[in-house]
Curated annotation (Swiss-Prot):
Gene: NAC100
Lineage: Eukaryota, Viridiplantae, Streptophyta, Embryophyta, Tracheophyta
DNA-binding segment(s): 113-172
Compartment annotation: Nucleus
SUPFAM superfamilies reported for this sequence: NAC domain
UniProt-listed PANTHER family: NAC DOMAIN-CONTAINING PROTEIN 100, PROTEIN CUP-SHAPED COTYLEDON 2-RELATED
Domain notes: The NAC domain includes a DNA-binding domain and a dimerization domain.
Domain NAC: 16-166
Name this protein carries in UniProt: NAC domain-containing protein 100
Induction: Repressed by the microRNA miR164.
Residue segments, region Disordered: 313-336
Amino acid sequence: METFCGFQKEEEQMDLPPGFRFHPTDEELITHYLHKKVLDTSFSAKAIGEVDLNKSEPWELPWMAKMGEKEWYFFCVRDRKYPTGLRTNRATEAGYWKATGKDKEIYRGKSLVGMKKTLVFYRGRAPKGQKTNWVMHEYRLEGKFSAHNLPKTAKNEWVICRVFQKSAGGKKIPISSLIRIGSLGTDFNPSLLPSLTDSSPYNDKTKTEPVYVPCFSNQTDQNQGTTLNCFSSPVLNSIQADIFHRIPLYQTQSLQVSMNLQSPVLTQEHSVLHAMIENNRRQSLKTMSVSQETGVSTDMNTDISSDFEFGKRRFDSQEDPSSSTGPVDLEPFWNY
């Protein structure tokens, strides 16, 4: 342990390059780390810690490692079950490690340098232990680097253990997920999520009733009970009603509306309507001038006059806009 503590002081002065990940191959673990540890027990590595697997449970190992997110590396000495035997003691207080499958040979070039054993941790005691998702790969020297070619002091048999936890899908679980497991139920608050409904003012379901502006016809049409609609054009009816009910019938504003409307068809409709009103106004002026010369009366009958006064009061009651231009003379428009 003195060596390990001394290494910790040296470790604080070492810097790793950006993006560094400790991801050695099986052959690199044997050649560059385990072989050096067996030759010199004081050897230490930046990314590999030292631990006694018989005194540590697998879920404690991630916090005992020097580094690693999904897998953790340790130097450890295999504990013999019997002093004179070769069987290894793999039991802990909570369970035991059980070997599974066949040992894998590790080569450097064409030379055998080590073996890899796969073990799974079981809770409880054999043979009724409960299998867990904790897995360990144990690396030992073999062949060219076997203990037979090493000094007798290396008989303690150092090994390197790689420990990780598998998920249900067979993937390794990172340590960050292990830390978050207990807090997932409390961190999530559905009330903090933004509303999925669109609060756009354009989605307002309120619709304005269409406004109809009646045309005042002659007495014959009134007797027939026919009511004409000046804006009976399909193009004009397709426009939102709330555009028109906000527009007073003043000359300045009507010109501004016609200029702001973007539809070419709508612009044509307004041009035709404006031309008809202007033509009617000219004919009315011509008729009035003729009547003054000939003495022909231009007075309207009582019914039309009453309708005219009623309509005029309705439009005169509107509030004048800020423009200095007065309201349009609607008399020719009503007579059309």
